[in-house]
Amino acid sequence: MPKVKSGAIGRRRGRQEQRRELKSAGGLMFNTGIGQHILKNPLIINSIIDKAALRPTDVVLEVGPGTGNMTVKLLEKAKKVVACELDPRLVAELHKRVQGTPVASKLQVLVGDVLKTDLPFFDTCVANLPYQISSPFVFKLLLHRPFFRCAILMFQREFALRLVAKPGDKLYCRLSINTQLLARVDHLMKVGKNNFRPPPKVESSVVRIEPKNPPPPINFQEWDGLVRITFVRKNKTLSAAFKSSAVQQLLEKNYRIHCSVHNIIIPEDFSIADKIQQILTSTGFSDKRARSMDIDDFIRLLHGFNAEGIHFS
């Protein structure tokens, strides 16, 4: 009998695994490659809806409705549900599920990529979205106007823990502080793999996000520019983080533009490195590390730079 090469066995197993991932439900095949993991546990679905505290007058934005397990429950509670779904097959399944029911007229479906879709007005958002778009979707939500009341969102467990991490936590990062600048964030519950069909490879969590209204009086692009620099190496002192030549070139360019606009003469012996160090020292952050700094610390640091004409966007 001829030997079967290990590479061929590996490829065959890979194809078998792919086929197993495309699970069938009523003839419908789920594509895990684009994050199709349908939440099937009715207890989890009911708990998520309870956490949303819906009002009869609410317009709900649902992202990733799948086959409508949560959608039909939302339609019973809300005035209207706007469901955003990428897969036309699931859209057809969704329409079929509510067709002829008393709540059918309350459903509007937007077909397409939610990141490229102009979101309508909504009061509350509920989402079980593909985990690979978690970060851009969070910030699309938080920068959306007019403000919504709250969002109940399913995320990969580690991503959820990053959202709620505090200064000093191992998972505290740029995502943590940027989200918490714009919103109050709470971890609501853990959701195991077997509550989905097909099961994902990671554990999940449900998070509640409530935007701060009014938002802090800060230019977010400017804020993020500063935070991005400091969290590249969050365990370094800020003095070390700002010694990067790329960072210094960017800040010097921005400073020279600022001086040109405001007719400020720059001395011939000007050194951006010296100016940065002077600001870090005067604000008391020279030896601080991003991993232990909170929102108020970063606001003070940003104001310190801006007061000296240095901007990050």
UniProtKB/Swiss-Prot annotation:
Quaternary structure, from the entry: Part of the small subunit (SSU) processome, composed of more than 70 proteins and the RNA chaperone small nucleolar RNA (snoRNA) U3.
InterPro entries, per database record: KsgA/Erm, rRNA_Ade_Mease_Trfase_CS, rRNA_Ade_methylase_Trfase_N, rRNA_adenine_dimethylase, SAM-dependent_MTases_sf
In the record, the note on similarity to other proteins reads: Belongs to the class I-like SAM-binding methyltransferase superfamily. rRNA adenine N(6)-methyltransferase family.
Protein name as it appears in the record: Dimethyladenosine transferase
Q: Which UniProt keywords apply?
A: Methyltransferase, Nucleus, RNA-binding, rRNA processing, S-adenosyl-L-methionine, Transferase
Where, subcellularly, is it found? Nucleus, Nucleoplasm; Nucleus, Nucleolus
Where it mainly occurs, coarsely classed, is: nucleus
| Gene3D superfamilies reported for this sequence | 1.10.8.480, Vaccinia Virus protein VP39
PANTHER family on file: DIMETHYLADENOSINE TRANSFERASE (PTHR11727), DIMETHYLADENOSINE TRANSFERASE-RELATED (PTHR11727:SF7)
**EC number(s) in its UniProt entry?**
2.1.1.183
Give binding positions for S-adenosyl-L-methionine: H37, L39, G64, E85, D113, N128
Q: Name the top EC class.
A: transferase
Q: Which GO terms describe its cellular component?
A: cytosol; nucleolus; nucleoplasm; small-subunit processome
Specify where the region named Disordered lies, as residue ranges: 1-21
One Gene Ontology term from the biological process aspect of the record = positive regulation of rRNA processing
Q: What does this protein do?
A: Specifically dimethylates two adjacent adenosines in the loop of a conserved hairpin near the 3'-end of 18S rRNA in the 40S particle. Involved in the pre-rRNA processing steps leading to small-subunit rRNA production independently of its RNA-modifying catalytic activity. Part of the small subunit (SSU) processome, first precursor of the small eukaryotic ribosomal subunit.
- Please provide, alphabetically and separated by semicolons, the GO molecular function terms listed in this UniProt record: 18S rRNA (adenine(1779)-N(6)/adenine(1780)-N(6))-dimethyltransferase activity; RNA binding; rRNA (adenine-N6,N6-)-dimethyltransferase activity
Source organism superkingdom = Eukaryota
What gene name is listed for this protein?
Answer: DIMT1
